């Protein structure tokens, strides 16, 4: 219908609109949802890219439906942003999406890749029962709120030594992913607060989930 065509045209215009040349921070996150296709329920992921502009505004600049994460997939997404005018991004903050680190290194070699701290904490607490969750979360906070990487690393060793005998798998990802967790210590306190609080993109994702349920 004409209405459908108009909506699809508007979506296409939005997905291809020109972007700013420079963004201080971009967040990439996935919203998982279910769709019915051929009388079957299919799981899909919508990848949302939320950018913080130079004047502090939040702007959703891309929404992609993806099935197969890979460095090739993410390189295509990032190159699309470049084709729309993006020349430089200071920090890209994302969870451990398959291939994202390699793609960022190719498309934006000067950009700092930062593992999402909120996701990192949540994934860790999955290994911890409710009775210890509050104390464990407080200990994790001493790592990412430390004033320097050296002190953060010392706290990482302390927390691991304290909890590893009880929950041997909980801290493994912090040790294995320290190279992409630790960039946060390079930034000012204001930038760090933006990175370890994902309210902006999480509220957006909860809205998408509500719309999907309708």
Regions found by a protein language model. Give the residues of each.
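Inter-helix linker motif
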Residues: 109-126
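Short, well-ordered loop/turn and helix-capping segments at boundaries between secondary-structure elements
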Residues: 83, 106, 130, 206, ...
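Acidic/histidine-rich catalytic cores and adjacent linkers
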Residues: 145-214
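RNase H-like nuclease fold core
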Residues: 2-93, 98, 102, 107-110, ...
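Generic structural signal for alpha-helix starts
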Residues: 129-130, 188
